[in-house]
């Protein structure tokens, strides 16, 4: 009798164990599929935000949206803030979170490959040049010519792609210039010094640090804002991602690779083989007539280059932006001044004037050995007012 009772007890305990394991696996599976559903809601929310932002109240304010009316688990929280010339979007669904850097599908209403304001001059195109997309130019049109003994050997612009430009470049949006102005007014004396290594999260607070005249072997992952009182040299051994840099003049050393947005009062220079990854940008505020951005050989910028204007001009032509033939910019180049561009621009080029500088002098209004083409996957910064459709920076 006692042995039967023992066996029955053991069988009962065994059945309880099996039921417990089954229930645990069921709960784990349910939890897994629930979290997968929440992640899917976050991805759907990004698509929704890219197409329509009217449900968002403003910046730095929490907004929620129920993706499927009547389904409480489909509610997603939105929080967005400006991050340089992009938007930082934080999404929450239950315990799941997603952080995205957002840009625009189009640079502005013009959707231009090349935009030159009306100056009463003809644009000369020479060498292996091509313009794929809309060309905005004054009423004098284009002429295909030669430089030295090199005749035009590129792709002619389709007549249907030539449009009439305005008297001036489209102006940057006031809210963007106001935001950048705030960057230059930071009182950095009260900030702590930057550590050599650090990692923050965009779901938290922005870290503000002051830096000296040179940074080396620094590894930071944003959101960080680093400010220097005057000139700054960034050595190529630094590894920076999601970082905003503010200084008077900035030079980035050979071989640097990272994702940074650099805002300078006077000038920015890139040495050789600098790679600025997606979500990067270079902005010079136009504080002097000698303002400039200069790219070195074999550089790549995935984001934007902006050189603001200044009413005081040098007596002789001066390149406010120089891009060598081995450099590539993917995104928007906006130069309120003279641009000396060679190489490739995948996206849009806006320039007050084009000049080709050579050893024997300079050629005004010359587009020579340049490729400017609209790329369907390009992400543009928030600079010029235009269509609201967003695209995630990847």
Language-model features: locations:
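Short, ordered "entry" segments at domain starts
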Residues: 79-212, 216-221, 225-228, 236-239, ...
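Beta-strand/loop motifs with alternating small/hydrophobic and polar/acidic residues, enriched
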Residues: 1-118, 389-394
